[in-house]
Amino acid sequence: MKLIIAIQSASDIITNSSSEVFLCQNNTTMSIQELKDFLYEYNRSNQFTGDWETWQKMSQEERNNYDMGGGMGGFLEVCSYDELDDDYWLKKLINECYDNPKQYLVVDTDWCHKATINWIIENLNAVNTEDL
């Protein structure tokens, strides 16, 4: 007997459904640690601090310039290759498919971090794991 479970993306398996997981190649001039620090700071500096009424009046385009806290925590986790568990499937994938694995980061973030996600997509060689 075989059980088949339909999923939307690989991130559905490893995180809750409001998460986005990106595999990012560091194609910047920053070191891996500098890039990690930058992503955390970028996320903090783009948090929306206004009130709900202001948020409701904003267009979706304006909202995409901010990161919001998700109802369940609104987390951001950035891991270098060396910080990944050896059994983690993405680390295994990096080992099998990519040269120079230490140039990769795994970014796990809540979908409501629109500004951070947009920066990752626009500035890093990033793959959303739902596309793997």
In which residue ranges do the predicted regions lie?
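Low-complexity intrinsically disordered segments
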Residues: 48-132
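Charged, amphipathic alpha-helical linkers/stalks
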Residues: 32-50
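Short, extreme N-terminal segment that most often corresponds to the first beta-strand
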Residues: 2-30
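Charged, low-complexity surface segments at secondary-structure and domain boundaries
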Residues: 19-24, 39-44, 74-80
